[in-house]
Amino acid sequence: MPKSKNAAALVTPRKRGRPLKTDDDSRRSDLVEKSARLFREKGYEKTTVRDIAAAAGMQAGSWFYYFKTKQEILAAIMEQGMARSLQDLEAIASQSLPPREAFRQLVQVHLHTLLAPEHDFISVLLYEWRSLDQQSRSTIIALKDRYEAIWDQVIQALHQSGDWAAPTRFDRLFMFGALNWTAQWFKAGSGTSIDALAEQAVQFILRTPQGKPD
C-alpha cells in the first residue's frame, strides 16, 4: 500500500554534516580525556595541537569543532575533574557517617582521584594551574571551595568527637600537601593498592596505632 503524502512528510532525512549531539558529547569527552593524559605526561606547554589530534584519532584541525583553543581544553579538563571529585565527596557528605568513617572515605576518594590510572584530571589541575587563564580560574575555584568545605566539615566533626585537635587554617593545607605528593612517588602495581595506601594515610593523619580499630 503506497504511503500517503502526509506520512511521507513526517519522515525527515537526517542532514549530513555535524554529528548527532550524543556523538558530539562522546567525542568531546574522549578529547578531554586524551588531552588530560598528554598534559599529565608531557606538560601543557609541550603538548601541541597535533599531539592532541593524533591521540584522539582526528585530523589536525578537526578538534577545533569542539574547542577553539588549547586553553579551553585545559579549562575543561580541570572543571570536569573537580566536578567528578566533588560529586563523590557530596555523596559521602549526604550520609550520616561517623566522623572517622567519613574521613576515611574522603581520603580514599582523594587518592583514587589522584592515582587511579584513568584519572589524569586532578594531576593536571595541581601541576598546570599557572597555565590556566584568569577567567577560567573563577569556575574552578568555586568548585574547589565546595570541595574543601566538605573536608573542613569532617575535620570539625573529628574535633568535636575528640579525634582532632583544635583545627587551624593550615591543617587542611598540610594534609592536602601530603596526600597530593603521593602522585610523585606512588607506582601502581608496586604491591600496595590505593585503598591500602588510603588506610595508611588515615592511620598516619589520625595517629591510629597499627592494629588498633578506629
Sequence positions of predicted segments:
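N-terminal intrinsically disordered/low-complexity leader segments
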Residues: 1-26, 96, 213-214
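Hydrophobic alpha-helical segments that form the core
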Residues: 4-6, 165-184, 196-208
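Helix-turn-helix
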Residues: 30, 34, 38-72, 76
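Short coil/turn segments at alpha/beta junctions that flank glycine-rich nucleotide-binding fingerprints
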Residues: 41-45, 95-96, 117, 161
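Hydrophobic alpha-helical connector segments
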Residues: 76, 90-120
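Amphipathic alpha-helical packing segments from all-alpha helical-bundle domains
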Residues: 83-87, 124, 134-160, 169-173, ...
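Amphipathic alpha-helical segments used for helix-helix packing
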Residues: 115-135, 184
